[in-house]
């Protein structure tokens, strides 16, 4: 009986289910997916129109979620790696509390946020490889973590 308990205890971390990838889009030059990177697993819906290509596309990323706190102040901590090389942490402030560019700024706790954010990769050349971006959304005066998402981008073609 002791070997069975020892064996099952040692292998349980190995046999647990890996973090489920949420499909985001699959284009001619990139596969993009995301998963949760914290235990909160906050319900969020992300899609793009058109599917993101890293070769000069532009469009909109659609985001829908219900914030657990007021969005008067909102910023993202971005941790990015390219082919396993870590880049410096980046802090991207979206909602300053005044003269904000985005309609969802000042949304209150419990209100549905449904927004479209424009993107463009015109003139940017991405080398092929494996990109990872962890995005932590931090909101409010108390700097509460709203959610954490781990984006994976596999760029299949070298455009240089």
Swiss-Prot record:
Tissues showing expression: Highly expressed in spleen, bone marrow, thymus, liver, kidney, ovary and decidua. Detected at lower levels in testis, small intestine and skin.
Signal sequence, renumbered to the chain: 1-18
Chain residue ranges for the region called Interaction with lipopolysaccharide: 119-123
Subcellular location: Secreted, Extracellular space; Secreted
GO CC aspect terms: extracellular region; lipopolysaccharide receptor complex; plasma membrane
Superkingdom to which the source organism belongs: Eukaryota
The keyword NADP appears for this protein: no
Keyword Nucleotide-binding: no
Disulphide connectivity of cysteines: 25-51, 37-148, 95-105
Xref: InterPro entries: Ig_E-set, LY96, ML_dom
GO molecular function: lipopolysaccharide binding; lipopolysaccharide immune receptor activity; Toll-like receptor 4 binding
Sorted UniProt keywords: Disulfide bond, Glycoprotein, Immunity, Inflammatory response, Innate immunity, Secreted, Signal
Example GO BP: cellular response to lipopolysaccharide
Record's comment on post-translational modification: N-glycosylated.
Glycosylation sites per record: 26, 114, 150
SUPFAM superfamilies: E set domains
Function: Binds bacterial lipopolysaccharide (LPS). Cooperates with TLR4 in the innate immune response to bacterial lipopolysaccharide (LPS), and with TLR2 in the response to cell wall components from Gram-positive and Gram-negative bacteria. Enhances TLR4-dependent activation of NF-kappa-B. Cells expressing both LY96 and TLR4, but not TLR4 alone, respond to LPS.
Assembly information from the UniProt record: Heterogeneous homomer formed from homodimers; disulfide-linked. Belongs to the lipopolysaccharide (LPS) receptor, a multi-protein complex containing at least CD14, LY96 and TLR4. Binds to the extracellular domain of TLR4. Binds to the extracellular domain of TLR2. Ligand binding induces interaction with TLR4 and oligomerization of the complex.
The name this protein goes by in its record: Lymphocyte antigen 96
Organism: Mus musculus (Mouse)
């Amino acid at each position: 009986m002791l070997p069975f308990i020892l064996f099952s205890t040692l292998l349980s971390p190995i046999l647990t289910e890996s973090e489920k990838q949420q499909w985001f889009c699959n284009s001619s030059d990139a596969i993009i997916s995301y998963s949760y990177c914290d235990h909160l697993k906050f319900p969020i819906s992300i899609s793009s129109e058109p599917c993101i290509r890293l070769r000069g596309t532009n469009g909109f990323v659609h985001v829908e979620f219900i914030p657990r706190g007021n969005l008067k102040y909102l910023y993202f901590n971005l941790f990015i790696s390219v082919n396993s090389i870590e880049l410096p942490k980046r802090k991207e402030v979206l909602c300053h509390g005044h003269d904000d560019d985005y309609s969802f700024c000042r949304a209150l706790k419990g209100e549905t946020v449904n927004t479209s954010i424009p993107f463009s990769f015109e003139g940017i050349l991405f080398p092929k490889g494996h990109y990872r971006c962890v995005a932590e959304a931090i909101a409010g005066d108390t700097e509460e973590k709203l959610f954490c998402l781990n984006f994976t981008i596999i760029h299949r073609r070298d455009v240089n």
